[in-house]
Design a protein with these regions (language model features):
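NTP-dependent small-molecule kinase module
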Residues: 1-6, 79, 103, 148-154, ...
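Short, well-ordered beta-strand core segments
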Residues: 115, 131-135, 188-191
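Short, well-ordered alpha-helices that flank and scaffold nucleotide-derived cofactor binding pockets
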Residues: 26, 30, 48, 52, ...
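Pre-Walker A (Motif I) flank of P-loop NTPase domains
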Residues: 5-11, 112-113
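Post-Walker A helix-loop "phosphate-sensing" segment adjacent to the P-loop in P-loop NTPases
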Residues: 29-39, 52-55
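ATP-dependent small-molecule kinase phosphotransfer cores
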Residues: 41-114, 121-124, 141-145, 161-178, ...
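Glycine-rich phosphate-binding P-loop
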Residues: 12-29
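Phosphate-binding loop of NTP-binding sites
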Residues: 32, 124, 128-130
Length: 219
């Protein structure tokens, strides 16, 4: 059901690494005609640009890069390399970097009234007034297997235990950082994606979305 007659509907999805937030967000966005943005990709893109250009002043550089960033540019590059993953965990803790990316996401939401944004702090910081909030959780082993399969496509040198360790560390950093930690919003609907296949996950999300649309718009 596309939301053609509806002027505004915004969904926020939060969750730890490889819990399925990106997959769920993309599929739901396609189904309902929403513009999709992955917060994680923004941080990965920032890491990619820093690794590639080695700027002296990282903050000013990132500010400049994100002034001209489009979704087309963001989705054009492979941002899921181990090097970018390691670097992303570090820059995600920097307050000024988070501020720049926060402003980018807020402006994105202002321009795109019908959108879905996924990340770690979307419901709590970026879109606290989103129409519907989801929080994904998943067993670490299941999440690590997903990430391992994803990374394996680009490199045969990837080891499962290393992926699992990196994911555990990243989740710990996300939960414990002072700036915008990963938290479940009080209004968020929790979905355990470790126990669901992709179609079941989308079905569960769709049920909640349809219910919310009916409450807000009466149809």
């Amino acid at each position: 059901m596309k939301l053609k007659k509806i002027n505004k509907f915004q969904i926020s999805i939060d969750g730890g690494g490889s819990t399925g937030t990106s997959t769920g967000g993309k599929l739901i966005s396609k189904k309902y005609g929403l513009t999709f943005l992955s917060s994680g990709l923004l941080y990965r893109y920032a890491s990619y640009q820093i690794i590639k250009n080695k700027p002296k002043n990282k903050i000013l550089f990132i500010k400049k890069v994100f002034k001209n960033l489009t979704l087309k540019k963001l989705n054009k590059i492979n941002l899921h390399t181990p090097e970018i993953s390691r670097h992303t965990a570090v820059i995600a803790k920097i307050g000024n970097v988070r501020k720049i990316l926060k402003n980018f996401q807020i402006n994105f939401a202002k321009k795109n009234k019908k959108c879905c944004i996924e990340g770690r702090d979307i419901s709590t910081v970026i879109l606290p007034k989103s129409d519907l909030k989801f929080f994904f959780k998943c067993d670490l082993d299941v999440a690590a297997r997903r990430r391992y399969r994803e990374l394996k496509r680009n490199s045969n040198q990837i080891k499962f235990l290393e992926v699992k360790k990196a994911l555990r560390i990243r989740n710990k950093l996300d939960i414990s950082r002072k700036n915008s930690p990963l938290l479940k919003h009080l209004d968020a609907i929790e979905i355990d994606t470790g126990k669901l296949g992709i179609s079941s996950m989308v079905k569960k999300m769709s049920k909640e979305i349809d219910k919310k649309i009916k409450i807000i718009y009466g149809s």
